[in-house]
Amino acid sequence: MTIKTLALQCRDAAHVLSQLSSSAKQALLEAMAAALEHDGAVILAANARDLEAAREKGVGTAMLDRLALDTKRLDGIAAALREVAQLPDPVGQITREDVRPNGIVVQKVRVPLGVIAMIYEARPNVTADAAALCIKAGNGVILRGGSEAIHSNTAIARALQSALREANVPEAALTLVEDLRRETMLELLQLSDIVDLAIPRGGEGLIRFVAEHARVPVIKHYKGVCHLFVDASADVDLAVRLLVDGKASRPSACNSLETLLVHADIAERFLPAAAHALRERHVELRGDAATRALLPDIAAASDEDYAAEFLDLILAIRVVPDLDTALTHIRQYGSDHTEVIATQDTANAEQFVQSLRSAVVMVNASSRFSDGGELGLGAEIGISTTRLHSYGPMGLEALTVERFVVRGEGQVRH
């Protein structure tokens, strides 16, 4: 079956989804969570095959962590589906209503986008998360995962599709692309008359390929080169907490810290404490000359280090003379994802927030809060770094669009 045929079937199934009531979608998602739990042993066995193949290829620890499933993670995926089931349904929400002078009633109403192509790499949880969010918002979803997770993704998709069948919803509403040739992905990205949105999540190469070749609209979930700037007025203990949580709690996450910028006036007090805390968590440090003057046993940082998304226990450090220099550094090397300032100076905090165009800006809070669930969206399909209709963590509302519904009593325009 061609990718165009699969996409057409998904579009037809999306129409069925768009007509489901909120209670029917909630019941469907609850059933999908139960199906994941029922097929848990099958899914974990499939994941073990993917992990074995990845190790044989010499895949790094960060990629292995993103790929790995265990009972706890699988339970977490099922719980996430149940959380999505309980979220308010955005479809049908009236976001604006106005009565015009001629008596017509003008409403803006949320409706599903249609068909969403989700293109991603080694995170099998995305298969379930993306499917749940798209279905809750009344969209069909075409899932194209990476070859590293093909067995895991297939097992998860089959479990979820079984719940669709039981609910008499066409299983094409959740379509997994099993032909992973790049030519097939390219063909999918050309289907502008069928696919309404493509969302790539993964490495820089994948996202560039999608952005350069797609004829459908694309919302990029680009790399997370996230910074913490420790201002001169920062509370040292607070800043160390933000640093350790942001770097070491889950370094493979896109909202983990990659670069630390430290005001010169606090560097002598802050850096030794920070280095001690990070070394306890086995973080490799790389710094500029001013940093190495205080931490002489660390490696030198290069320009490539400051631009890197390590996704590992590695941190680049630079000492800066002032806030403006920190902001210039972030604008040069950052990826518009998430930036953090530790400061007790309200004016500096406001300047930091207003001077950056990043999707998420934090003041005295960990970068790890850059997450849909943590920010009150309930769940997210990813973190958009594209300045379109959605910017930052994308929840259910970002998977809908607003259209006008006009109600009248025979009014005409002369």
Swiss-Prot record:
EC number(s) on file: 1.2.1.41
A molecular function (GO) term: glutamate-5-semialdehyde dehydrogenase activity
Keyword annotations: Amino-acid biosynthesis, Cytoplasm, NADP, Oxidoreductase, Proline biosynthesis
CC annotations in GO: cytoplasm
Origin: domain of life: Bacteria
Pfam family, one: Aldedh
Associated pathway: Amino-acid biosynthesis; L-proline biosynthesis; L-glutamate 5-semialdehyde from L-glutamate: step 2/2
Biological processes per GO annotation: L-proline biosynthetic process
Subcellular location: Cytoplasm
Record bears the keyword Oxidoreductase: yes
HAMAP family, A to Z: ProA
Function recorded in the entry: Catalyzes the NADPH-dependent reduction of L-glutamate 5-phosphate into L-glutamate 5-semialdehyde and phosphate. The product spontaneously undergoes cyclization to form 1-pyrroline-5-carboxylate.
Stored PANTHER family: DELTA-1-PYRROLINE-5-CARBOXYLATE SYNTHASE, GLUTAMATE SEMIALDEHYDE DEHYDROGENASE
Entry similarity comment: Belongs to the gamma-glutamyl phosphate reductase family.
Full protein name: Gamma-glutamyl phosphate reductase
UniProt lineage: Bacteria, Pseudomonadati, Pseudomonadota, Gammaproteobacteria, Lysobacterales
